């Protein structure tokens, strides 16, 4: 079986797993996102883009959230996926994700050690970083990794620079295996596709995404299947901090 077949099978399993929120059917958002043009100027640094809170605005937001969610699920590097998202939606120039290292420590749980296949005495490092594109904090990541399974240079970069984890270890040609993927914000209420009475939204108020919109948990492995990192990523509402797509 090819790597592409493996990824297709993995996505199928994830798609069937019950999540805290249902995922918009791929056929719907794939069509929708083709017709969501990007604002000509993009989002100004530090601005808060005002989206209308009506049905169309909420449907656009949902389609874009699901578009990002599937991009994250179908690629091994969340860092490079966010690079592309930042560039496509003109959130900053240059469109490059950087990490802001927070000097705190969170010991790995027994479950994390089990996922990483390490014993109770083996060293596991912790890296806590917001991931920023320009002035926009797009996600925050808790990362536990086994330094003995990285190169000396990779460990140096992780310990001394603002390089995002996925970029620092890119040379390992790692694979990402999703443990869970949850949509934390659902802009439309349950039953929206059936013309629910709940679809009467106020048009005079802006649509403001909450602080957290998507959460992923994943394990990264070497090409031979050896795990070396477990990551918990929480994506912020700032992923939509660009002008609402223009309407006809």
Where are the regions a protein language model picked out?
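N-terminal secretory signal peptides that target proteins for export/translocation
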Residues: 1-20
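Hydrophobic alpha-helical segments, especially transmembrane helices
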Residues: 17, 22-23, 35, 128
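Charged/polar low-complexity intrinsically disordered segments
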Residues: 4, 22, 109-112
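Intrinsic structural disorder/low-complexity segments
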Residues: 7, 37, 219, 225-227
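N-terminal domain-onset segments
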Residues: 42-126, 130-132, 136-199, 204-214, ...
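Bacterial N-terminal signal peptides
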Residues: 25-37
